[in-house]
Amino acid sequence: MQYSRVFLIVMDSVGIGEQPDAPKFNDAGANTLGHIAERVAGFSLPNLQKLGLGNIAPLKNVEPVAAPMAHYGKMQEISMGKDTTTGHWEIMGLHVSTPFNTYPDGFPQELISEFEQRIGRKVLGNKVASGTDILDELGEEHMKTGAVIVYTSADSVFQVAAHEEIVPLEELYHICEVARELTLRDEFAVTRVIARPFLGQPGNFSRTANRHDYSVKPFAPTVMNRLQDAGLSSIAIGKISDIYAEEGVTQSIRTKDNMDGVDQILGTMKQSFTGLSFVNLVDFDAKFGHRRDPEGYGQALMEFDARIPELLEALQENDLLVITADHGNDPVHHGSDHTREYVPLLAYHKGIQAGQHLGIRETFADLGATIADNFGVTAPVIGKSFLNRL
């Protein structure tokens, strides 16, 4: 075992340039980090720059460095999707060869009718929408009628929004459990049901931190399952536990936002364990990518960058820190959907003198294979370990 603890940070949606197959996903020219760097005045990421972020691809104001503190490269997604679930499942060794069902015209009336009958409330919306736009459009009507807001996106999701003072949280969660049950049927299949509670008044609604995801279980064991089976820790922070439907999770820690996510992974660095601590920093995607807000996205990246020294300081000699992403979400791209991009790969431990180029990894699963290799557990079916290059 080269490292007794691996800390994995997924910067949700922080892509680093279009993949060769991007045109098939209508994403030619997408470059999340590159376009943010170009658009945001005063943008700089000095700590990620020292780790080698600017050595991976050209980024304005994030120049390459002669001796990066981390090994660096980028990873390509091979699965047939560009959503959170697909990206995370591939990281942990699964190849999603069939795209998940999406509902560009809303959900079938048969599903909605049964859903309404089961929950005892009517449905508003039932269409593709941005989470903030649909609250502006239907939030007031929801408050007057008590009907829940149902919407989807370009991803395979069934989202239910409700005001916490109109529909109590426990009822909303029960409503989503009903939706999860119904959407496990092949004819209505979705990957995730998401509870989207909000507060506020018309014209000033805001989503709360009480979001809850109900994901389908991975179709095969992931590297996290292998760690758990071997008696090792597999700590899931933020929405990680939801993404894997609690499979292969030995401890689950909820988070409120990106900075809380950093606080929580720092907290696990103070724990004594052998295994993986895995966090998803969702704000980049949820608050800024989908809303096409490059300034907000850039600010969030700079806030995360400012926390890097704390993370490096908290690591022990035999710890490995990996920073990556799960897909892109270019905030200057057309539409409001994720984008098909390479993701950055930074791997740091205290023994590195000068980071080496890890190349373009052929699949996100190379990361899962590396973690499996380190802990001596069964390797995933796809992915090549780069442990010997660290």
Curated annotation (Swiss-Prot):
Annotated protein name in UniProt:
Phosphopentomutase
What family is this protein classified in?
Belongs to the phosphopentomutase family.
Q: Where does Mn(2+) 1 bind?
A: D12, D326, H327
Q: What does this protein do?
A: Isomerase that catalyzes the conversion of deoxy-ribose 1-phosphate (dRib-1-P) and ribose 1-phosphate (Rib-1-P) to deoxy-ribose 5-phosphate (dRib-5-P) and ribose 5-phosphate (Rib-5-P), respectively.
Q: Which domain of life is it from?
A: Bacteria
| Gene Ontology cellular-component terms listed | cytosol
State the pathway, as annotated in the record: Carbohydrate degradation; 2-deoxy-D-ribose 1-phosphate degradation; D-glyceraldehyde 3-phosphate and acetaldehyde from 2-deoxy-alpha-D-ribose 1-phosphate: step 1/2
Query: What Gene Ontology terms for biological process does this UniProt record contain?
Result: 2-deoxyribose 1-phosphate catabolic process; 5-phosphoribose 1-diphosphate biosynthetic process; metabolic compound salvage; nucleotide metabolic process
* Major site of localization recorded for this protein: cytoplasm
Which Gene3D superfamilies would you find in this protein's record? Alkaline Phosphatase, subunit A, Phosphopentomutase
- The protein's organism comes out as Brevibacillus brevis (strain 47 / JCM 6285 / NBRC 100599)
> Gene that codes for this?
deoB
- Residues annotated as binding Mn(2+) 2: D285, H290, H338
